[in-house]
Amino acid sequence: ADGRSTRYWDCCKPSCGWAKKAPVNQPVFSCNANFQRITDFDAKSGCEPGGVAYSCADQTPWAVNDDFALGFAATSIAGSNEAGWCCACYELTFTSGPVAGKKMVVQSTSTGGDLGSNHFDLNIPGGGVGIFDGCTPQFGGLPGQRYGGISSRNECDRFPDALKPGCYWRFDWFKNADNPSFSFRQVQCPAELVARTGCRRNDDGNFPAVQIP
């Protein structure tokens, strides 16, 4: 199938971090304001008043080599719903912009309330907070536009240390691509992604495995 991408990092608890969203072994990990994992899956999101649960800093993208990356996204898949995509993994092959031909495997950790069909909102710190801003209550906020985020690599230097690598990734591996299109297919989740979210779908074995370079 063909899809389109945007980018965001709102610091909020991932929507797949709540119990009973999907047939999975456990919900996606959330973290406290200091980016430490919390074990209470019922903890209120930091994007709500009095909330304590935020996105974990390791649920951000990284390069495996020049042509292959791993990461996470909020998704909205045509003909499916949150029960169908929470913690599912997808192999994206970019088809436009400076990343055309590169591949990325992402795990769905959230659902974009403002997303269209076959839309992947890639988790990229500094990509813009979008509708919700959990970054301001978490650590005082991030620079950049609400939609689209920052515009230059050196702005990443002002980020919390834990979020810098994912911010730099956008300007390095991702070549500051602006919402590139891609083709995608569902695949088995690589262990490298599950290690960061803790979440694997019960039906994960039904999908083709991906060779990580």
UniProtKB/Swiss-Prot annotation:
GO biological process: one example: cellulose catabolic process
Record's keyword annotation contains Oxidoreductase: no
GO MF entries: cellulase activity
EC number: 3.2.1.4
Top enzyme class: hydrolase
Family annotation (InterPro entries): GH45_Enzymes, Glyco_hydro_45, RlpA-like_sf
Positions annotated as active site in the UniProt record: 10, 121
Record's keyword terms, sorted: Carbohydrate metabolism, Cellulose degradation, Glycosidase, Hydrolase, Polysaccharide degradation
SUPFAM superfamilies, sorted: Barwin-like endoglucanases
Domain of life where this protein originates: Eukaryota
Catalytic activity: Endohydrolysis of (1->4)-beta-D-glucosidic linkages in cellulose, lichenin and cereal beta-D-glucans
Entry similarity comment: Belongs to the glycosyl hydrolase 45 (cellulase K) family.
Name the record gives this protein: Endoglucanase-5
